[in-house]
A protein has these predicted regions:
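Generic structural signal for well-ordered alpha-helices
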Residues: 67, 95, 118, 153-157, ...
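Conserved alpha-helical substructure of the radical SAM core
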Residues: 2-120, 126-127
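Conserved strand-turn element in the central/C-terminal portion of the radical SAM core barrel
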Residues: 155-181, 185
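Anion (oxyanion) recognition and catalysis
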Residues: 99, 160, 190
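Conserved radical SAM core fold
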Residues: 41, 85-87, 111-118, 131-146, ...
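Helix C-cap/helix->beta junction micro-motif
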Residues: 101, 124, 162-166
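Alpha-helix N-cap and loop-to-helix initiation/capping positions
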Residues: 58, 62, 143-151
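Structural recognition of alpha->loop->beta junctions
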Residues: 119-135, 186-190
Length: 190
Protein backbone atom coordinates (compact mmCIF):
# COMPACT_ATOMS: atom_id res chain seq x y z
CA UNK A 1 0.00 0.00 0.00
CA UNK A 2 1.30 3.43 -0.87
CA UNK A 3 0.58 6.28 1.47
CA UNK A 4 0.65 9.64 -0.15
CA UNK A 5 1.52 12.52 2.10
CA UNK A 6 0.92 16.11 1.16
CA UNK A 7 4.15 17.75 0.08
CA UNK A 8 4.91 21.19 1.48
CA UNK A 9 4.52 23.92 -1.06
CA UNK A 10 7.51 26.23 -1.48
CA UNK A 11 7.02 29.63 -0.01
CA UNK A 12 7.32 32.55 -2.42
CA UNK A 13 10.62 33.60 -0.82
CA UNK A 14 12.06 30.10 -1.15
CA UNK A 15 10.90 29.80 -4.74
CA UNK A 16 12.56 33.11 -5.62
CA UNK A 17 15.94 32.14 -4.12
CA UNK A 18 18.77 32.17 -6.63
CA UNK A 19 20.61 28.90 -7.20
CA UNK A 20 23.70 28.26 -5.12
CA UNK A 21 26.90 29.42 -6.77
CA UNK A 22 29.19 26.84 -8.28
CA UNK A 23 31.89 25.87 -5.85
CA UNK A 24 35.40 25.99 -7.21
CA UNK A 25 37.91 23.32 -6.30
CA UNK A 26 39.98 23.90 -3.21
CA UNK A 27 42.87 26.16 -4.10
CA UNK A 28 43.82 27.46 -0.65
CA UNK A 29 44.93 25.62 2.46
CA UNK A 30 45.00 28.18 5.28
CA UNK A 31 45.51 25.61 8.06
CA UNK A 32 47.81 22.62 7.73
CA UNK A 33 47.78 19.87 10.37
CA UNK A 34 51.23 18.36 10.57
CA UNK A 35 52.18 15.09 12.27
CA UNK A 36 55.96 15.42 12.70
CA UNK A 37 56.16 11.81 13.96
CA UNK A 38 54.04 9.10 15.58
CA UNK A 39 55.35 8.98 19.13
CA UNK A 40 53.31 9.57 22.26
CA UNK A 41 53.98 9.62 25.98
CA UNK A 42 50.44 8.56 26.96
CA UNK A 43 48.72 5.20 26.66
CA UNK A 44 45.19 6.46 26.13
CA UNK A 45 42.27 4.08 26.24
CA UNK A 46 40.77 5.50 23.02
CA UNK A 47 43.94 5.76 20.95
CA UNK A 48 46.61 3.49 19.54
CA UNK A 49 49.20 6.01 18.35
CA UNK A 50 51.41 5.02 21.29
CA UNK A 51 51.64 1.49 19.84
CA UNK A 52 53.43 2.74 16.71
CA UNK A 53 56.82 1.15 16.31
CA UNK A 54 58.20 3.48 13.67
CA UNK A 55 60.91 5.87 14.76
CA UNK A 56 60.65 7.95 11.60
CA UNK A 57 60.40 11.71 12.03
CA UNK A 58 59.70 14.53 9.65
CA UNK A 59 62.99 16.32 9.03
CA UNK A 60 63.22 20.07 9.48
CA UNK A 61 65.00 20.20 6.11
CA UNK A 62 61.92 18.65 4.46
CA UNK A 63 59.71 21.33 5.97
CA UNK A 64 62.13 23.99 4.71
CA UNK A 65 61.91 22.50 1.18
CA UNK A 66 58.09 22.46 1.25
CA UNK A 67 57.60 26.00 2.57
CA UNK A 68 57.43 27.71 -0.83
CA UNK A 69 54.68 25.34 -1.96
CA UNK A 70 52.81 25.75 1.33
CA UNK A 71 52.96 29.52 0.94
CA UNK A 72 51.57 29.22 -2.60
CA UNK A 73 48.68 27.24 -1.11
CA UNK A 74 48.09 30.04 1.38
CA UNK A 75 49.12 28.16 4.52
CA UNK A 76 48.96 30.68 7.36
CA UNK A 77 48.95 28.30 10.32
CA UNK A 78 50.42 24.88 11.05
CA UNK A 79 48.91 22.75 13.79
CA UNK A 80 51.53 20.43 15.25
CA UNK A 81 49.93 17.17 16.25
CA UNK A 82 51.14 13.65 16.77
CA UNK A 83 51.16 11.71 19.22
CA UNK A 84 53.04 14.25 21.21
CA UNK A 85 54.83 16.78 18.98
CA UNK A 86 57.12 17.78 21.87
CA UNK A 87 58.82 14.36 21.58
CA UNK A 88 60.19 15.24 18.11
CA UNK A 89 63.98 15.36 18.34
CA UNK A 90 64.33 18.53 16.21
CA UNK A 91 60.97 20.19 16.76
CA UNK A 92 62.41 23.65 17.40
CA UNK A 93 64.41 23.58 14.14
CA UNK A 94 61.19 22.67 12.33
CA UNK A 95 59.37 25.51 14.12
CA UNK A 96 62.14 27.97 13.24
CA UNK A 97 61.56 27.28 9.54
CA UNK A 98 57.81 27.82 9.94
CA UNK A 99 58.33 31.03 11.90
CA UNK A 100 60.87 32.29 9.38
CA UNK A 101 58.20 31.91 6.69
CA UNK A 102 55.69 33.89 8.76
CA UNK A 103 53.51 30.86 9.48
CA UNK A 104 51.70 30.71 12.81
CA UNK A 105 52.03 27.62 14.99
CA UNK A 106 49.47 25.88 17.18
CA UNK A 107 50.74 23.06 19.38
CA UNK A 108 48.49 20.15 20.31
CA UNK A 109 49.91 18.47 23.40
CA UNK A 110 49.27 15.92 26.11
CA UNK A 111 50.78 18.53 28.41
CA UNK A 112 53.20 16.11 30.05
CA UNK A 113 56.30 17.78 28.57
CA UNK A 114 55.18 21.41 28.75
CA UNK A 115 57.14 22.13 31.94
CA UNK A 116 60.40 20.98 30.33
CA UNK A 117 59.76 22.88 27.08
CA UNK A 118 57.86 25.97 28.30
CA UNK A 119 60.51 28.48 27.15
CA UNK A 120 60.62 27.07 23.61
CA UNK A 121 56.83 26.67 23.44
CA UNK A 122 56.24 30.34 24.17
CA UNK A 123 59.07 31.37 21.81
CA UNK A 124 57.67 29.46 18.83
CA UNK A 125 53.98 28.72 19.37
CA UNK A 126 51.10 31.17 19.13
CA UNK A 127 48.82 28.96 21.17
CA UNK A 128 48.67 25.58 22.86
CA UNK A 129 45.78 23.14 22.97
CA UNK A 130 46.09 20.47 25.64
CA UNK A 131 44.18 17.24 25.98
CA UNK A 132 42.01 17.21 29.11
CA UNK A 133 39.80 14.16 29.36
CA UNK A 134 38.31 14.49 32.81
CA UNK A 135 38.82 15.53 36.39
CA UNK A 136 42.03 14.21 37.99
CA UNK A 137 41.14 10.53 38.52
CA UNK A 138 39.28 10.14 35.22
CA UNK A 139 42.00 11.92 33.20
CA UNK A 140 44.72 9.75 34.76
CA UNK A 141 42.71 6.60 34.09
CA UNK A 142 42.05 7.51 30.44
CA UNK A 143 45.64 8.62 29.80
CA UNK A 144 46.93 5.48 31.55
CA UNK A 145 49.88 7.45 32.94
CA UNK A 146 50.39 8.02 36.68
CA UNK A 147 49.94 11.68 37.64
CA UNK A 148 49.18 12.74 34.04
CA UNK A 149 46.67 15.32 35.30
CA UNK A 150 49.17 16.81 37.73
CA UNK A 151 51.91 16.97 35.07
CA UNK A 152 49.46 18.63 32.68
CA UNK A 153 48.51 21.22 35.31
CA UNK A 154 52.18 21.97 36.07
CA UNK A 155 52.94 22.28 32.35
CA UNK A 156 50.11 24.72 31.73
CA UNK A 157 51.26 26.76 34.73
CA UNK A 158 54.83 26.81 33.36
CA UNK A 159 53.67 28.07 29.96
CA UNK A 160 51.46 30.75 31.54
CA UNK A 161 54.32 31.82 33.85
CA UNK A 162 56.68 32.12 30.89
CA UNK A 163 54.20 34.11 28.78
CA UNK A 164 50.82 34.98 30.29
CA UNK A 165 49.52 36.18 26.90
CA UNK A 166 49.93 32.77 25.24
CA UNK A 167 46.51 31.15 24.93
CA UNK A 168 46.25 27.68 26.41
CA UNK A 169 42.98 25.92 25.73
CA UNK A 170 41.77 22.37 26.10
CA UNK A 171 40.15 19.66 24.07
CA UNK A 172 38.40 16.55 25.29
CA UNK A 173 37.69 13.25 23.60
CA UNK A 174 34.23 12.34 24.87
CA UNK A 175 33.98 8.61 25.48
CA UNK A 176 32.47 5.96 27.72
CA UNK A 177 34.95 6.67 30.53
CA UNK A 178 34.21 10.41 30.80
CA UNK A 179 30.86 11.34 29.25
CA UNK A 180 29.23 11.56 32.67
CA UNK A 181 31.90 14.02 33.84
CA UNK A 182 31.79 16.73 31.17
CA UNK A 183 30.87 19.50 33.62
CA UNK A 184 33.84 18.46 35.73
CA UNK A 185 36.08 18.58 32.64
CA UNK A 186 35.04 22.18 32.05
CA UNK A 187 35.57 22.99 35.73
CA UNK A 188 39.01 21.31 35.67
CA UNK A 189 40.01 23.49 32.73
CA UNK A 190 39.70 26.62 34.85
Amino acid sequence: MTILRPQPQPTPAAAARPPLPRVDPITRLPILILFPHSHCNCRCLMCDIWRATTRAELAAADVARWLAEWQQLGVRRVVLSGGEALMHSHLWDLCAHLRGAGIGITLLSTGLLLTRHAAQVVAYCDDVIVSLDGPRAIHNEIRNIPRAYEKLALGVAAVKAAAPAVTVSGRCTVQRANYRHLREVVHAAH
